[in-house]
Each structure stands twice: as C-alpha cells, then as structure tokens.
Amino acid sequence: MSGELPPNINIKEPRWDQSTFIGRANHFFTVTDPRNILLTNEQLESARKIVHDYRQGIVPPGLTENELWRAKYIYDSAFHPDTGEKMILIGRMSAQVPMNMTITGCMMTFYRTTPAVLFWQWINQSFNAVVNYTNRSGDAPLTVNELGTAYVSATTGAVATALGLNALTKHVSPLIGRFVPFAAVAAANCINIPLMRQRELKVGIPVTDENGNRLGESANAAKQAITQVVVSRILMAAPGMAIPPFIMNTLEKKAFLKRFPWMSAPIQVGLVGFCLVFATPLCCALFPQKSSMSVTSLEAELQAKIQESHPELRRVYFNKGL
C-alpha cells in the first residue's frame, strides 16, 4: 500500500466518534449533504472503485486520507450498504433536504382546500414509500404487501388527520390552521414507520455485544429502535413546519405578498429548506445509530440465553435504523 495512507483506516465505520452528539452530527451533515445528488455517474463509480480497492489493500498513488473519506461518504450516499446496488436518486439521504423542502413547502402553502390536501399528502407519502423502499434492509427486504399496506395506511392517516383538523380549525385563528400539515405528517410517521418495520416487531432485530457478536433477536429492541426513529422523524419535520407559519402569517399581511401572491410558495419552500438543512442531520444525530439497552429489558427467554452464555454482560447493542 502507498506510504501516504495508513493501511488500517476503518472505512466501514463513520469518520467521527458516534458516542457523542457532535460526532454523530458531523457524520449526518456529511451523509445528508444535498450536493451529493449532483454528482455524475463517473464520480460515483470512481468513489466506488476507491472504496472497493482500499478494502482489498489497493491504493492509487497520491490518494490522501481526506480523499479516501470523501470517496467513502460519496459511496455511502449512493449505494445500498447491503446489496451494493445504486439507489434510486430521490430515495438517497442526500435527496432528503431538497425533496422535503419542496413537498413540505407546498403542503404548507396549499392546505386550505380538500383537493390540495389530498394531492400533497399523497405526494408526501409516495415519497416516503420510495425512501423506505430504497433504504430497506438487504437481509430482510420488504414485501410488496408490507410496502403497500404501510403506504395506503400512512396516506389515509395523513389525509384523515389533515381534513379532520381543517374542519376543526375553520373557526379559529388562520395561524392555527397553518399547523394542520405538521399534525398530518406527525400522524403519518406514527403509522408509516411501525407498519414499514412490522416484521421487526414480530420477529425482532439482531442484538449484539459491544464487539458486534450476535446474541439473538429481540422485539423489545425493535420497539425501542422504532420509537427513537419516529421521535427523530417528527422532530426533524418540526422546525420546517413550525417556524415558517409564523413568518408567512406576518408576510402575507404585507403589501409585497398582496401584490405578488404567487411568491408565497417559493418563499415558503425556501424557509422550509433553510430549516431542514440543519434539522435533518441534527435530528438524525439525536440517538446513536448503534443504540443499546439493558439486558434486563429484553424478553425473558433471550435474557436467560444471554445470562447463560455471557453472565457478565449488562447491555446489548442494535442498529436502530433511520
């Protein structure tokens, strides 16, 4: 290997310490960088070659550590971690901010009529379905039935919440009405994510010791993982759906937007995008990707199995998902 690059860099793990919030935030700011969706196929293939070659002990002359890490994050942003296949463009983490800012901005601009609510909630849940399918587990892929059930249920839940709250808020302040899309998105997340991961709730997710040695499967760990993901997804949407309504409520009373009402949607999308650039990585970083729980919180059968084989073990670890 080249003398410029140490041979033992672990590019299977993130570059920053994942036991700290700052380390996780740095990691997700890199993973969700929207500029990655602008990369050409040639740049993606170059990054894939660098990563694959390095894992085989082959390093191009002059490759630096920073260039290796850049290639690793480009590779991770575009290729599925289990299958190695190139992911659908809009399903990649780097597409989250531009896609969500557009959809959320439009949901919050066109929320007053039933057809608009139906259309934008359907668009939002269709996008969520693409993201969930793109980032599915390679070991336990989603079936068409599971994907369809989650998609239909989340769309129905979001639309019902939005239409119900629209009816309730007709006689209150217009500002309150602007928060209806956020309530619909929160309700949809509470439906969509557990349904999308229903197999994990039934059979459990793999739990390991600190060194990654597999100890069994736990549905209790799956419940904790899914709860953390639901919380982070709702909080991720909160700034972009809670701050712009106050700003737009003030702006729409000004002469500028009264004269140019068509500017409302672009301004709303821009405000949402600004919030999401920070909220997306920071909320992904709220909980460690490698989450943990006490052995005593596991199912009795798994507890007994672990206590028999690893009597000194106090905590188990698992991948919480995104």
Curated annotation (Swiss-Prot):
What tissues contain this protein? Highly expressed in tissues with high one-carbon metabolism activity, such as blood, liver and kidney.
Q: Where, subcellularly, is it found? A: Mitochondrion inner membrane
List residues in topological domain: Mitochondrial intermembrane.
121-146, 196-228, 288-322
Any one GO MF term held by the record is: L-serine transmembrane transporter activity
Q: Which GO terms describe its cellular component?
A: mitochondrial inner membrane; mitochondrion
The annotated topology with respect to the bilayer is: Multi-pass membrane protein
Catalytic reactions on record: L-serine(in) = L-serine(out); L-alanine(in) = L-alanine(out); L-cysteine(in) = L-cysteine(out)
Q: InterPro entries given for it? A: Mtc (IPR004686)
Going by the UniProt record, its keywords in alphabetical order are:
Acetylation, Amino-acid transport, Membrane, Mitochondrion, Mitochondrion inner membrane, One-carbon metabolism, Transmembrane, Transmembrane helix, Transport
Instruction: Name positions with the PTM N-acetylserine.
Output: 2
Q: Which GO terms describe its biological process?
A: erythrocyte differentiation; iron ion transport; L-alanine transport; L-serine transport; one-carbon metabolic process; serine import into mitochondrion
Residue ranges, Mitochondrial matrix side = 2-102, 168-174, 250-266
Ranges that cross the membrane: 103-120, 147-167, 175-195, 229-249, 267-287
For this protein, the record's PANTHER family field holds: SIDEROFLEXIN, SIDEROFLEXIN-1
Assigned protein family: Belongs to the sideroflexin family.
What does the protein in this record do? Amino acid transporter importing serine, an essential substrate of the mitochondrial branch of the one-carbon pathway, into mitochondria. Mitochondrial serine is then converted to glycine and formate, which exits to the cytosol where it is used to generate the charged folates that serve as one-carbon donors. May also transport other amino acids including alanine and cysteine.
Q: Which NCBIfam families match?
A: mtc
Write the protein's name. Answer: Sideroflexin-1
Q: What is the species listed in this Swiss-Prot or TrEMBL entry?
A: Homo sapiens
